[in-house]
């Protein structure tokens, strides 16, 4: 687990467009957050307001994400106007993206948070999971109450994630992961059938079932979104997942930060379990470790893998090396 990254998700019984419009208005933070209260509007997309994790006010800024796949935004926070040190990407997945052809309505909300280890306080680190998880439930209730619901709606799926820091250029990661032939190197549960090239290819899974794996890459804000689709033709079964490849310099607002965060977003049934594809979040996590090892080796950063799954700022690495030399 990447210890500087936090994610929370919810199924919300409202339309994706309704949720998107609601989230784009910073003033609505007053209604569902613990104590983000907007006090003064600076421009169309920026306010000054109170904060749950600080004694002083913050600047809040919202940015719409341009994607043909689904709605998304980013919230940004900082102590000065246009100088933001926290970024919170939000994606809204329609049910038919998760399960093509489904009749389920609503939207799956996913909220990602980064806390720069160079700026974080102990309270932020200890409290962010609790606060954001509760705020996510509050957001769900606010939107569902507007739809006339009196209790929480339950979706057919839930979201789980795996996150790891990769000390290699994000462009190297994109070039490596978009080539389906490289799956034979970093994935251990499938084997290729014949020669592979491009962004789609045929494989056999761990039970010798035929599966076509497709990879698609999209630019999103200052980072990349990678779609991975498993399709079992003999069972007409799809399993889709999404990965965000976010430069550490952007996620932690630190130009000295190298590498990128690999954040994998996966979808699982609330009732029953899959019989094909990846069957547990650890299947994704194991792959991510392999991806990290291969990419860091390609980048010449052979020491990074031993440091674990989390980003460590340059100055902390220098301190550790100094201590280790004495």
Predicted regions and their residues:
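Beta-strand/loop substructures that line and gate deep hydrophobic ligand-binding cavities in soluble
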Residues: 74-141, 231-293, 302-306, 324
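Short, exposed beta-strand/loop patches in secreted or surface proteins that constitute
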Residues: 37-41, 60-65, 100, 190-196, ...
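Short, hydrophobic/aromatic-rich segments at coil-to-beta transitions
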Residues: 41-49, 66-74, 195-202, 219-228
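Short, surface-exposed coil-to-beta transition loops
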Residues: 5-7, 55-60, 80-90, 159-161, ...
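Short, charged/polar surface micro-motifs in flexible loops or helix N-caps
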Residues: 53-56, 64-71, 81, 207-211, ...
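Short, flexible loop/turn segments with low-complexity composition
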Residues: 149-155, 300-312
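Hydrophobic ligand-binding cavity/cleft-lining segments
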Residues: 1-43, 141-197, 317, 321-326
């Amino acid at each position: 687990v990447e210890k500087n990254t936090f994610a929370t998700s919810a199924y919300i019984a409202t339309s994706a467009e309704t949720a998107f419009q609601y989230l784009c208005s910073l003033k609505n933070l007053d209604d569902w957050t613990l104590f983000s209260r907007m006090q003064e509007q600076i421009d169309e997309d920026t306010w000054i307001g109170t904060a749950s994790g600080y004694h002083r006010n913050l600047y809040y800024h919202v940015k719409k994400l341009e994607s043909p796949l689904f709605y998304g935004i980013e919230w940004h926070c900082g102590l000065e106007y246009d100088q933001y040190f926290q970024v919170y990407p939000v994606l809204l997945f329609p049910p038919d993206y998760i399960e093509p052809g489904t009749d389920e309505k609503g939207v799956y909300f996913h909220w990602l948070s980064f806390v720069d280890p160079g700026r974080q306080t102990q309270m932020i680190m200890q409290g962010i999971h609790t606060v954001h998880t509760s705020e996510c439930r509050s957001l769900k209730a606010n939107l569902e109450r507007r739809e006339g619901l009196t209790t929480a709606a339950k979706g057919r799926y839930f979201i789980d994630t795996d996150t790891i820091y990769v000390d290699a250029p994000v462009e190297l990661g994109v070039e490596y992961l978009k080539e389906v032939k490289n799956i034979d190197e970093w994935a251990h549960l499938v084997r290729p059938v014949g020669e592979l090239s491009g962004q789609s290819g045929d494989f056999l899974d761990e039970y010798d079932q035929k599966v076509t794996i497709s990879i698609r890459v999209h630019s999103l804000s200052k980072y990349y979104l990678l779609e991975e689709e498993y399709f079992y033709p003999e069972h007409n079964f799809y399993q889709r997942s999404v990965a965000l490849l976010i430069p550490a310099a952007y996620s932690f607002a630190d130009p000295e930060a190298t590498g990128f965060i690999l954040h994998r977003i996966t979808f699982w049934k609330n009732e029953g379990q899959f019989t094909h594809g990846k069957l547990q979040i650890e299947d994704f996590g194991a792959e991510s470790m392999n991806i990290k090892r291969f990419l860091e080796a390609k980048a010449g950063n052979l020491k990074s893998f031993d440091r674990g799954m989390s980003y460590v700022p340059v100055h902390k690495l220098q301190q550790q090396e100094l201590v280790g030399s004495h």
